[in-house]
Structures are given as structure tokens and as C-alpha cells.
Amino acid sequence: DIIVNPFSIISSEINIALTAPNIFKLEKWLYKIDDLSAPLRIFPRGLYIICGYGRMGQKIFEKLDKNNIEVKFIEIDPKRGRQLSKDEKNYVVFGDADDRDFLIQTGIMDAVAVVAVTNDDTTNLSILATAKKLNPEIMTMARENDLADDYLFKSANVNHIFTPSKILVNKVTNALFNPLCDIFIKLIINKDNEWASQLVVDLMQDINKNPLVVEVEINLENTPEIYKHLKSNEQLYLKILATSLYNREDKNKFIPLLLQRKN
């Protein structure tokens, strides 16, 4: 079964961007969103103001708090205040995040990032525009609810756009049609930035900025000669894959990423 929570994925991406930006770069390449030459996505440290205390905002807060990053929430619905714990009341304020004076009062001038994650795209874009006027250097992040608004978000030059519906499609499609790639993505999250940085360099130097990812199942139908060789308990080295089928003098450019055994 494929169970996907887009808000958990988004918050995990933010966590990776904070702790290991080169793993974030590899993820974007594997999901065919960017190539490996894309600029490294660096998330600054400092005060983050999150507008919208819903499920997505709370998931993002968990990861920011884990990285010891100061967070302030702005929530427009005062009814939510009745449900807040004593701890939550320390970092959630109630008001209009699109109000210039209220943003200043909340600390927008000292913030390094503003995150608009309400369920209304017009509201999110308006909040970011107001914040950007007050603090031109601030990093902007937004939730895009409707794919039809994609042009508006790109025109607004939002630094990071998170679209739950698009993330769901990418994740499910990858898991169904590229299962080994999906496993590899889950594994690299546990690696560090130095490891990921070296892999990015190797891929770009040995192949190109956008290598093709190929999944091969070794069996009698797909790879008969390799299968027979292995079944006879003979050793087989990966370097054989570097030899071109068409000309023994030519070399294939490849880097093995993952080997999964059935047992």
C-alpha cells in the first residue's frame, strides 16, 4: 500500500533543506523537478513567521523546532485559541497576517522567512506581497492549493512553492513506476550532506547534469546472460555494465545507486 501525507513530505523537505541541502537537490533530480546544476536551496536560520496554524503549518513547525529555529505563528481564526495548549499559546498570535502593522508587531522586520500556508491562494499571495514590501530580503514560502493558480505563484517570484496535490502525484507515480528509485529516496534521507555533495559531483562529472535513471530487474527474461552467469555461482563485477554492447572499445557512463536483493 502507498500511504502519502503531503504535509509530512513538505515538512521533511524543509528539514532536509536545513540540514543537508544536497540531499534535497538529489530528491528534486530524482523526482524530475530540477537537474543537478540547479542552485542549492539554502534555508536560512533565524526567525520564521508561519501564517496559518493548520495541519501543514504544524507539521512545518515540528521540523523547524527540531532544528532549534525560532517560530511565530499568525492565525486569523480566534476560535482556534480555545483548543491551544499552554505551550502553543507561547508562539501563536491571533490577527490578520496581511495587515502591515500587525506583521511589524509580530516581528516581520527581523524575520528571515515568512511561510503562508492557509487554504486560500489569494490570501497566501497577498500575505507574502505585504511581507516582502516590509522586508525585501525575507525568504518567501507558500502553499499552493489550486494548480490553476500556478502562473500567479510563479509571477509573484515566491522562493519556495509547495503544492500538496502535485506532491501527491509525484510521490505516488514514483512509487508505482519507479519503485527502486522510491526506495533510494527513502534511504538517502539518512545520509549526510557531505555524502550527497560527493554524489552530485560524481554524477555531473562522470555523466552529465541530468543523468537518466534506469531500473533493471535481473531475471531470465530481461537479462538472460547475466542471470545464467549468476545462477552458476560465478562472480560478476559491475564494471561489465560499463562496456558498450555495440563496441567493446566504447564505455557506458554510469554510476550504480542501489542494489536490492529479493532475499
Please give the residue ranges for each predicted region.
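Phosphate-bearing ligand-interacting subdomains
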Residues: 1-18, 86-180
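Cytosolic regulatory domains of K+ homeostasis systems
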Residues: 2-83, 159-263
